[in-house]
A protein has these predicted regions:
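Terminal alpha-helical segments
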Residues: 1-129
């Protein structure tokens, strides 16, 4: 049951992101990356539970795969696109780093919280967080 390890990692990243956001112990760019890791792991655990190994590691790639298998809340589409604004994909061209504002981080935390709830509902997991 490899999917459980992805769920556990996602929950750990989630807790770290929430704590760092509330305590202001990390910069917003670091919090963004922790939130992104949580999102990626939550999506991966759902896909793996259904026996589907994600072809892409990006949030938008996994989201497209999730939509093929599940009825995903429509509002997640806008949140995935929002997260992509800050993603620095591998490229030969140098792209400027976009540092999220406190408001951006709040939106990210809101998204990962909603995603967490949806994942736990799909997997019939009782949250301990």
């Amino acid at each position: 049951m490899e999917w459980k390890s992805y769920y556990t990692e996602a929950a750990d990243y989630y807790k770290a992101a929430i704590g760092a956001s509330q305590k202001k112990t990390l910069g917003n760019l670091v919090i963004y990356n922790v939130v992104a890791m949580s999102i990626e792991n939550y999506m991966t655990c759902v896909l793996m539970k259904t026996g589907f190994i994600p072809e892409h590691a990006s949030i938008s790639g996994m989201f497209r795969e999730l939509k093929k298998l599940y009825e995903v809340p429509e509002e997640f589409q806008a949140d995935v696109r929002f997260m992509n604004r800050f993603m620095n994909f591998c490229s030969l061209e140098v792209a400027p780093v976009i540092v999220p504002t406190d408001e951006d981080v709040g939106r990210m935390i809101s998204f990962v919280s909603s995603l967490k709830g949806w994942v736990e509902s799909c997997l019939e997991i009782k949250s301990t967080i």
